[in-house]
Swiss-Prot record:
Residue spans binding DNA: 136-195
Subcellular location(s) per record: Nucleus
Record keyword Transcription present: yes
Protein's UniProt name: Homeobox protein DLX-5
Biological process, per Gene Ontology: anatomical structure formation involved in morphogenesis; BMP signaling pathway; cell differentiation; cell population proliferation; embryonic limb morphogenesis; embryonic skeletal system development; endochondral ossification; epithelial cell differentiation
Domain of life: Eukaryota
Keywords attached to this entry: Developmental protein, DNA-binding, Homeobox, Nucleus, Osteogenesis, Transcription, Transcription regulation
Pfam families the UniProt entry points to: DLL_N, Homeodomain
Amino acid sequence: MTAVFDRRVPGIRSSDFQPPFQSAAAMHHPSQESPTLPESSATDSDYYSPTGAAPHGYCSPTSASYGKALNPYQYQYGMNGSAGTYPAKAYADYGYGSPYHQYGGAYGRGQSSAGQPEKEVAEPEVRMVNGKPKKVRKPRTIYSSFQLAALQRRFQKTQYLALPERAELAASLGLTQTQVKIWFQNKRSKIKKIMKNGEMPPEHSPSSSDPMACNSPQSPAVWEPQGSSRSLGHHGHGHPPAANPSPGSYLESPSAWYPAASPLGSHLQPHGSLQHPLALPSGTIY
């Protein structure tokens, strides 16, 4: 057993196998320093012979492609190391990832700065409260008395504004078009709700500046005495006995009951009674 092993060991450790192994070791050291080619590249695939491989997986000592694949890389490394124009250790000294991280950091900062306005716009709308998204309402617009009066006057004219009218009204009042539009929408919905309940909106009620509107509720009280006196006069002229004299006048003046018994011009009594029906009970002519 020992004799056979001693005989086979010199065959494995031959002089032909030693130089490629050293060159392979020399190649692996610069590949770790150089960032251009990783360790497992296309040149590493030439380490193994496609046809004749050793039982333990070592590469063939007489592989022609192995030497040819190493020569360009060795020459390139030699030129880079000697010339100094593009030194292979430059990336290793400064760090291969440093330029990438610098540019990456600048790009990341540019993205974050560009995304900041979007976050600022989105923050007032949604906010996390107790782990739940909650909409944050914008503060209500406080209108001045002048603005409210102008909006009310325009709303009485028309409940819907065109775009030019809305822009003109907003510019004259110092408001935005959105504020004017929302005010008109709220006013329309409020009036619809009031009319649905059967009530009259305050702006459509009779105004105090209209004299006819002020006098219209009092007109029955003003005309009632005149109507009552007219009705009394009508009944008095048409029906003389309908007058209401005092009870003593009936006892003192029997001529009211018997007009023909009067000694003076009885033919004038009916005419006089028709003209003055209320004067007969007060006194009689004898």
